[in-house]
Amino acid sequence: MDHLPIFCQLRDRDCLIVGGGDVAERKARLLLEAGARLTVNALTFIPQFTVWADEGMLTLVEGPFDEALLDPCWLAIAATDDDAVNQHVSEAAESRRIFCNVVDAPKAASFIMPSIIDRSPLMVAVSSGGTSPVLARLLREKLESILPQHLGQVAQYAGQLRARVKKQFITMGERRRFWEKFFVNDRLAQSLANADEKAVNATTEQLFSEPLDHRGEVVLVGAGPGDAGLLTLKGLQQIQQADIVVYDRLVSDDIMNLVRRDADRVFVGKRAGYHCVPQEEINQILLREAQKGKRVVRLKGGDPFIFGRGGEELETLCHAGIPFSVVPGITAASGCSAYSGLPLTHRDYAQSVRLVTGHLKTGGELDWENLAAEKQTLVFYMGLNQAATIQEKLIAFGMQADMPVALVENGTSIKQRVVNGELAQLGELAKQVASPALIIVGRVVGLRDKLNWFSSH
């Protein structure tokens, strides 16, 4: 280990930055956030330093580097574009036993500054020891995507409860189990983020009053249409905290590879070699696993509340008193149309969009007269088997037979395939396409030749 990672308490302590440019400004911003009493010494200063000085946030000393400025300091940073000046600052600080950072010269520095993920009071620092700053930045960005923005508020609130937890729970094991359920409670985190004091208090009292082996919870997560990059940050956080993930065939392998490694996985979809699990059985799986105290993620393709039967699953949980929450996903209509160069709305062609299921409840019938109206885009989910009927009904109710249509197979994935044609051909076109696929009907389909971008990459 070439460097010892430490966190310095700099509040109301003197620090010096030598340099007045953009790099010095970035370093100054960090020290000011840490509460340092800051002096900046340079020949010239960019405007931001003058603004800070006018607001009384720091002191500016214009002119060449003055060693005497180091005397009261705990820490210094050399951030000029002159290597000789930076070396001078480093040597002067070293002789006074003051830690000094030299920008872009780790060998000349007595400390280096890491990439920081700030969820105050929780802080995460990432460093490559100065050997690969880009790698450290990329790791920081990955951690930024994983750690919720409101995590700091949760940590702050946890600090306020420590005395109460210590008083109520006698053993270390009990305290550990309490904190484990505290830090994964989405309702509490969201209430803190919303500054909803009433909800925070209610959730807190529930956490303290329920047994430590209480029933678990279910999180309904939309996985998006296929491309793992379209999974939301909150969705990613949930699948990485799950004890068990119940998923269907519309969830891509790339997304399943992001699930916590030691989480149990239960496949409930339909594909070669598997039978479709009835919806009622899926409901019971969610209920049973949550009642064991597990954190259950029900992972669905697209958005769980758009033809995903998410509402039915939650009704079962609600009736049983199981806590639940929902993380929406990018629905297939949005993802597949965007990846196919098909804007769902357009001021010249479509002033509205309709999302329609092609899989009707027994005895159901669609409002074909309104669906056949002009100036709109229709998106049919699960419509391949009904393509001939969709064609027949729309034409019968007045839609032009030459209306452009597109069928998007495996949308947003590297296997995406788009078949174009006219409404009069829809039944035949559907025979060329395999599920999962969407049917898009409307004048906007005619823009595909101009706006298609995904296949060209």
UniProtKB/Swiss-Prot annotation:
UniProt catalytic activity: uroporphyrinogen III + 2 S-adenosyl-L-methionine = precorrin-2 + 2 S-adenosyl-L-homocysteine + H(+); precorrin-2 + NAD(+) = sirohydrochlorin + NADH + 2 H(+); siroheme + 2 H(+) = sirohydrochlorin + Fe(2+)
Keyword annotations of the record: Cobalamin biosynthesis, Lyase, Methyltransferase, Multifunctional enzyme, NAD, Oxidoreductase, Phosphoprotein, Porphyrin biosynthesis, S-adenosyl-L-methionine, Transferase
Pfam families: CysG_dimeriser, NAD_binding_7, Sirohm_synth_M, TP_methylase
InterPro entries (UniProt xref): 4pyrrol_Mease, 4pyrrol_Methylase_sf, 4pyrrole_Mease_sub1, 4pyrrole_Mease_sub2, CobA/CysG_C, NAD(P)-bd_dom_sf, Siro_Cobalamin_biosynth, Sirohaem_synt_dimer_dom_sf
Region (Precorrin-2 dehydrogenase /sirohydrochlorin ferrochelatase): 1-204
Modified residues (Phosphoserine): 128
Example GO BP: siroheme biosynthetic process
Residue span of region Uroporphyrinogen-III C-methyltransferase: 216-457
This protein's name: Siroheme synthase
Organism listed in the record: Salmonella arizonae (strain ATCC BAA-731 / CDC346-86 / RSK2980)
